[in-house]
Amino acid sequence: METTTKKARSLYIPYAGPVLLEFPLLNKGSAFSVEERRNFNLSGLLPEVVESIEEQAERAWLQYQGFKTEIDKHIYLRNIQDTNETLFYRLVQNHLEEMMPVIYTPTVGAACERFSEIYRRARGVFISYPNRHNMDDILQNVPNHNIKVIVVTDGERILGLGDQGIGGMGIPIGKLSLYTACGGISPAYTLPVVLDVGTNNQQLLNDPLYMGWRHPRITDDEYYAFVDEFIQAVKQRWPDILLQFEDFAQKNAMPLLTRYRDEICSFNDDIQGTAAVTVGTLIAASRAAGSQLSEQKIVFLGAGSAGCGIAEQIIAQTQREGLSEDAARQKVFMVDRFGLLTDRMPNLLSFQTKLVQKCDNLQHWDTENDVLSLLDVVRNVKPDILIGVSGQTGLFTEEIIREMHKHCPRPIVMPLSNPTSRVEATPQDIIAWTEGNALVATGSPFSPVIWKDKVYPIAQCNNAYIFPGIGLGVIASGASRITDEMLMSASETLAKHSPLVNNGEGLVLPALKDIQVVSRAIAFAVGKMAQQQGVAVKTSAEALQQAIDDNFWKPEYRDYRRTSI
């Protein structure tokens, strides 16, 4: 179903009466004109007054304000989305800064945990393991033929909350909402998918309301065969799809990305999207301090697929700035629950092995511990940047932050774990422990910190700055793959839009109200790089920009004309 053509063109549709009112992509509610009500058998089915979308949005905003809890606000917005998608996106667009934390992190975490309890109406595709041999038929049941973006999860590692089974569907729904709200991708082009391979969450298995397959998770060869069946079915149904892997467990995330990134246009937002926005933030923060990222020493807490993905992209950026690969890797230190990753540590995962430090280079360190803790690393490395992707709250202690600040006058501290209940340290504490000198960026939204009568804005290192623009760029350019260079171009473009760099003050990342401008710029950079990399047909810059404009959907009602099926 095409919904992105210019507003001047009417849309010819075959649906009428109550069926039309039940179709979220087409429903206008009280905004159907008198003529449309007559032509589509809606007379008497709606109140007398014909309203504009702004009048509808104002009523919805007043209703929204009447809800007291974030989860109730989330449920309300999801209800609008499942009733009238155009109104939903107009409302979100009008109040993006207020509503983004409600439709996505941190509130979406609670929505995933309570998915079966708060379930109202079907959205997206649920593919359970018992139905694995019917995937082609299942995907044929999707009514929208022109799907261009799929976000898929298996629900095993939802934010920092772990295994949520099919409750993980809240993540693809929320992510795709941001593709549209921030990146202008028509909701008619998007499809959320959950692969229901069971759950190891005993609380869910014991819950009489749980709506997923009640079975322990399948693993190993059975699991990978199931995912492969899904990938092949998607390629058959939509050969030019952009597929985003979301919230897969560490043991599966990197292998799936490695296996499929050159087979289908795909990326993993937890690994590559998080890395791209983090690197963009660090490039901007370094420039604001009058230096380059290649001059910084960086310590990570958390050496999973997300942390290692960020580290590898940092290393790639510092090589672009002139470092050799060996010199770049010597500036990055990875700490996990077993301590600093070293070349003598057993049982490392394949993606961790290139990020170890050589024990021979650590012999001069001031420590008597066999296992090198985060405090040991901070004390000896004297880092400029500390990044948390551990998923564990409170691990950036006062002692660690003060030790870092002792050797770094303006430390950059980024507790990126989601949701807020999992953050390594709160911005309030970090600002206080560094006497107001830290630059703080978080994974979840936090209010500005007031410390000694001064206001410190807290940047949210939100993947929404990156993935909507990547999606728009891929669609506009027709890219067949997402390369590392395309991701780096997104990071560089984000850094160029930093108010702190451009104005000498303000946040290190753009305000959310400007996110559509940033997404368009990233889309152009990504599309241009795709052309340079040979994964998209080369066009002029003007043609690429026109393609971006043509694909940028706006939440506006179109005139309807009746046609037969």
UniProtKB/Swiss-Prot annotation:
<keyword id="KW-0479">Metal-binding</keyword>
<comment type="similarity">
    <text>Belongs to the malic enzymes family.</text>
</comment>
<dbReference type="GO" id="GO:0004471">
    <property type="term" value="F:malate dehydrogenase (decarboxylating) (NAD+) activity"/>
</dbReference>
<dbReference type="GO" id="GO:0008948">
    <property type="term" value="F:oxaloacetate decarboxylase activity"/>
</dbReference>
<dbReference type="GO" id="GO:0051287">
    <property type="term" value="F:NAD binding"/>
</dbReference>
<dbReference type="Pfam" id="PF03949">
    <property type="entry name" value="Malic_M"/>
</dbReference>
<feature type="binding site">
    <location>
        <position position="270"/>
    </location>
    <ligand>
        <name>NAD(+)</name>
    </ligand>
</feature>
<comment type="subunit">
    <text>Homotetramer.</text>
</comment>
<dbReference type="Pfam" id="PF00390">
    <property type="entry name" value="malic"/>
</dbReference>
<dbReference type="InterPro" id="IPR046346">
    <property type="entry name" value="Aminoacid_DH-like_N_sf"/>
</dbReference>
<dbReference type="InterPro" id="IPR023667">
    <property type="entry name" value="NAD_malic_enz_proteobac"/>
</dbReference>
<feature type="site" description="Important for activity">
    <location>
        <position position="270"/>
    </location>
</feature>
<feature type="active site" description="Proton donor">
    <location>
        <position position="104"/>
    </location>
</feature>
<dbReference type="InterPro" id="IPR001891">
    <property type="entry name" value="Malic_OxRdtase"/>
</dbReference>
<dbReference type="GO" id="GO:0046872">
    <property type="term" value="F:metal ion binding"/>
</dbReference>
<dbReference type="InterPro" id="IPR012302">
    <property type="entry name" value="Malic_NAD-bd"/>
</dbReference>
<feature type="binding site">
    <location>
        <position position="418"/>
    </location>
    <ligand>
        <name>NAD(+)</name>
    </ligand>
</feature>
<feature type="binding site">
    <location>
        <position position="247"/>
    </location>
    <ligand>
        <name>a divalent metal cation</name>
    </ligand>
</feature>
<feature type="active site" description="Proton acceptor">
    <location>
        <position position="175"/>
    </location>
</feature>
<dbReference type="InterPro" id="IPR012301">
    <property type="entry name" value="Malic_N_dom"/>
</dbReference>
<dbReference type="InterPro" id="IPR037062">
    <property type="entry name" value="Malic_N_dom_sf"/>
</dbReference>
<feature type="binding site">
    <location>
        <position position="270"/>
    </location>
    <ligand>
        <name>a divalent metal cation</name>
    </ligand>
</feature>
<dbReference type="InterPro" id="IPR015884">
    <property type="entry name" value="Malic_enzyme_CS"/>
</dbReference>
<keyword id="KW-0520">NAD</keyword>
<feature type="binding site">
    <location>
        <position position="246"/>
    </location>
    <ligand>
        <name>a divalent metal cation</name>
    </ligand>
</feature>
<feature type="binding site">
    <location>
        <position position="157"/>
    </location>
    <ligand>
        <name>NAD(+)</name>
    </ligand>
</feature>
<dbReference type="GO" id="GO:0005829">
    <property type="term" value="C:cytosol"/>
</dbReference>
<dbReference type="InterPro" id="IPR036291">
    <property type="entry name" value="NAD(P)-bd_dom_sf"/>
</dbReference>
<dbReference type="GO" id="GO:0006108">
    <property type="term" value="P:malate metabolic process"/>
</dbReference>
<keyword id="KW-0560">Oxidoreductase</keyword>
<protein>
    <recommendedName>
        <fullName>NAD-dependent malic enzyme</fullName>
        <ecNumber>1.1.1.38</ecNumber>
    </recommendedName>
</protein>
